[in-house]
Amino acid sequence: REDYLPAARELLSSIGEAHSAFNSTLILRERGVNAVFVDLSGWRDQDTDSMEETISGHLAGLDFASCMPIVTGYAKCKEGVMAKFDRGYSEITFSKLAVVTGAREGIIHKEFHLSTGDPKLIGADKVRTIGHTNYDIADQLADMAMEAIHPKASKAMELAGIPIRVANAFDPGNPGTLISRDYVAPTPRVDMICGRRDVLAIEVFDPEMVGEPGYDYNVLASFAKNKISYIAKNTNANTITHFVSEKSKNLDKCLKELKEHFHGAQISTREVAIVSVIGTNMKLPGFLHRAAKALAESKINVLALDQCIRQVNMQFIIDREDFETAQKALHRELVEHEQI
């Protein structure tokens, strides 16, 4: 059963994408658009090339100035796009298309705007659309499970210097958010308050850790073996805490291995949430103070705190019951007050 499932997923994805692209082409032609169906699904191809070769071969001879290519989101390739990228495969194809064709800009249509906060939680009248940000911030959002585009897709476009515009399909008059490589807000500000509540803290406490080279390396070896990526991390003299998604596969297996390997350590877990304050230009004294003060005034205890020297993301680890209150408090202090 496990042997044929990957191939079946690839086949089903290719059929669905080909059907959608073909119908879209016919609809556009009926409306006077010179649309051209470009089928990358490869269902008739005997040979399998790399994705770049597949795209280049199928686009060869097309004059983009006189026609509109309607391309399948699925592209047959040696590496198996569904197996490698799962449900984000269409954004990988999108990215490769942009790079191969030397696009001026890539536009992704979502069902939402990239906003300063969750409008359903904070209120549509209190949030604003983020007009411009950079790829660094897009990475931070992906870690919060809020990816505007698949991280592996954005990397290819970032390296090629191609900006991405995230537009709301239900608000066509709004230019949306432009994500470019080097943008930094002209004045210090917070761009977004966001977070995730599906976080598990894995704490390793061991008095023998003090001054012991490679201790953390051995902890991470188990994470790597079980393909578990961490979102945030705290350390002190005798404690290392990694914050991971509780939905991570092999989590129980990883915890069992840690307990077997570190006999003298106390290994514990705790369900937590992370709320992030993100911005391209926050290198100003006072942002952290204001954020911590806003949480304290809302009676929220900060369990842990992370911020790298580059100062684009402050992560507050809190109890899950405070998740929504924390976002409202931080948005009110760091975004809404700045707009007054």
Label the model's feature ranges.
Residues 105-109, 164-166, 231-232:
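Short hydrophobic alpha-helical runs that function as membrane-insertion/retention elements
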Residues 65-66, 160, 226, 298:
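Structured helix-beta-strand junction loops
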Residues 1-149, 154, 317-319, 338:
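Nucleotide/pyrophosphate-binding catalytic subdomain
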Residues 175-340:
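A conserved regulatory-domain signal marking ACT and ACT-like small-molecule sensing domains
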